[in-house]
Amino acid sequence: MKVITILEPGKVEITEKEMPEVKEGEALLKILYGGICGSDLGTYRGTFAYASYPRIPGHEFSAQIVEIGENDRGLKPGMIVTCNPYFNCQRCYSCERGLVNCCETNETMGAQRDGAFSEYITMPVERIYDGMGLNPRQLALIEPFCISYHGVSRADIKKGDKVLVIGAGTIGVLAAVAAKAKGGEVYIADIAEEKLQYAYKTFGFAGMIKNDSEESLANSVSQITGEHHGFDVCIEAVGLPSTFQNCMDAAAYGGRIVLIGVGKKNLDFNFTLIQKKELSIFGSRNALKADFKELIELVKCGGIDLEKIVMNKGCADAAKRSEYELEEAAAAFEEFHQYGGSKLKVLIHFSDPSEITEHNR
């Protein structure tokens, strides 16, 4: 079978690998669509904190069940599904308290272990979720929405809260969508004009901020919230020291800050600002089983049009293209790297669903 492998920073190849062996308690899945996450792109660039090589990327995906044994989940061959890609130990202190998303030895597909960018993978049955009739593109977008939704939930947003999301990539935009759904008055900031305009117009946020300098951001914060007020909630969805500092500067006294972005660099800052403003700062990692189930249902009911996160559908221009075939994986990564300012989510099409009529194993 064909497998996408990042051999080293800047080098993607399609390699051949044996079909995986299905073990007890696992299912064989055929991958349909995969989304290139910011962490996958970071692995390609050599900037992701958890990167190692060679690595099969991919933890945002939809799949079709090919083989599955008897189970109590109602899962059968032929079903279109998505999966929880965070492997936890179930033994550490975090797992014992139900905080499996921040397991001390967590292994996320495509990061600490090989990912889903293969024609076929095996997956423990308990990590597979019925797609509830959503199409394969939608299901490939559920996992990043879960990341954003989980982070936003940490902020305890109340109706009318002024919310600033810094970062107009996939995670940032979906965080803004989630914050709006929770009743927030949402503003989104970024340096990439095209993505910023698209997100603002497409999802109907209260406003947008071109975050091209500290002065520009400060002026916008004052105009929106009133002089010396600031935002009730700031969500960092980039992973840079500068954007974390932006959040502390933009937050109101008594404000809440959530860090979703993942970075490698240390930040030298005046920590007295946290004490002075009495800021509450929350980390956010991965997502929970409940997030997946809740958001599949939300999208099914029409609450969110997830496919809008894919810009320029059908466009063949390398600078704007957002969908690629498996054989074009190297181009997908390189063009996302080169033209990230004009792309939100990039999808790779692996295969279409097929008629599967075999009985459960």
Language model regions located:
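C-terminal hydrophobic helical "lid"/dimerization subdomain
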Residues: 245-249, 289-361
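Glycine-rich beta-strand-centered segment in the early N-terminal region that forms part
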Residues: 20-34, 47-93, 132-134
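Residues in the short beta-alpha loop(s) of Rossmann-like NAD(P)-binding domains
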Residues: 192, 263, 287
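Cysteine-cluster motifs in flexible loop/terminal segments that predominantly coordinate metals
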Residues: 37, 75, 84-132
